[in-house]
C-alpha cells in the first residue's frame, strides 16, 4: 500500500495509475487547508449577508430560480444527495470507486468549491479505511456532471446506502463504524459540490487509458513475435521511413519494434534472400497503425490528466474577489471525446492483431503448418481460436462508435446538451477485455509459430516473451481443451509485464 501526501491539483498520471491498481492511504498537504477554509468562509458570508446565490440557497436545474429559506438549507443538502442517488446496474469495482473518491478529494481541496475541511477529511478517512461506497455503473449522462454516481458515492456521509469492505457488502452505518466516523450534516452548497463534477467518468476513462497503454505494449511485443514467427522483414521499421512522414507516434512505435527485434536474429538471417518481396500490412504497417493508436493514447492522457486535477463542480468560489460564479465545468465533453479516441485505439489494436492471427494460421502466407498444428485434419489447431479472436474484434467495432455524438436533453430541457461521457468511458473496460482476448490468442499463435521455426532462434526480447508464456502454456502438439490456454495467456497480459519491454517515455503513465 502506498502513501500519498496530496497537494491539490498536482496528481501525476503515474500516481493515478498506482491509485487505480492498488490501495493507497491519503494525507492532505497542510498547504491546502487555508484555501479550503477561506472558500467555505465565503459561502457562509453569502448567507450572513442574506444574498441569493445559485447552488448555495436556491434550488437546482430548472428550479434554480427558487430561493430556499435559511431553515431549509441543511435539508436541501440532504435532499439533493438522496434524490440524485438514482443510479442502476451493477456496482462499480472498489478500485474505480477509490479512484473516484481520490479525484473528488483532489478537486474539492483546491479551494474553489466552498466546502468545509471536515467533509474532505471524511472522504479521506473512508479511503484510508478501505471502506468504499457502492456506486451503480449506470445512470449518468455526463452533464450536469456525474450526478447519480457521485450521489451514491456520498450517501455514506449521511449514513445512507451500502458500502463495500474487503469484498463484502455492508450498511453505511457499519462502514462508518469501521472507519471511526459519525454521519455529517452538510452545510449550504456542500451537497451540490459533492455530487456535481466529472469524477466518475474521469475515473472510468483513466482506467481505460491505463488498459490502452498496457494493450499497446502487449501489441508491440506480440506483434514483434509474429514478425519473427512469420519470417517477416525488419526493413519496414527502418527509422528513415518514419522520419520521412514525421508522425511522432509512428516514429516512436517503429523505434519500439527496432528495440524489440534488434538488427537481426537467427530467424531473420535465415530468410535474407527469400523470394518474398513485401509482408502483408498487418506485419509491415504496424508502426503506422500502432503509432496512430499511441498518438490517441497520448492525447487522451493529456486531456484526462488535466481533468483529474481540474475543478468541475458548479458554482465556483473565487477567493481573490469573493465572486461566486455559475458556469459549466461539469460538462464532461472533454472526457467523452478522450474516451471515444481511446475506444478507437483499443478496437484497432485488436483488429490488426486478429489479422496477424489469420496470417499465422494460413500456411500460404506464413509457410507454417495449417492452423499451426502437426497432423492437420486429425487436429484442428488454432482454427476456432482465430474465430474467437474475430468475434471479439468485431464486437469492439460496434463498441467503438463514438458516444460523444449522442445527446439527450434532461431536466426539463434546462440541461439540453449532454456528453454521455460515463458510458463512453465505461465501455472501455469491456473493449479492453476483448482486445486482451485477441492478443492472448495471437500470443499463443506466435509462440506456436516460433516453436515451428526451431532450432532457429528469434530476437532476444521475443525469445524472452515466448519463454514467459511457455512457463504457463506448453507447446500445442495435438488438439486439447483450448480455453484454459487462452485464459492463461490473458492472465499474463493482465499483469502488464510487457510494459517493461518498451523503452522509457513511450507510455504516458509508466
Swiss-Prot record:
Any one GO molecular function term: histidine ammonia-lyase activity
Reaction it catalyzes: L-histidine = trans-urocanate + NH4(+)
Cysteine-cysteine disulfides: none
2,3-didehydroalanine (Ser): residues bearing it: 144
Signal peptide per UniProt: none
E.C. number: 4.3.1.3
Name this protein carries in UniProt: Histidine ammonia-lyase
CDD domains reported for this sequence: PAL-HAL
Species of provenance: Shewanella piezotolerans (strain WP3 / JCM 13877)
Subcellular location: Cytoplasm
A single Gene Ontology CC term: cytoplasm
The protein's annotated pathway: Amino-acid degradation; L-histidine degradation into L-glutamate; N-formimidoyl-L-glutamate from L-histidine: step 1/3
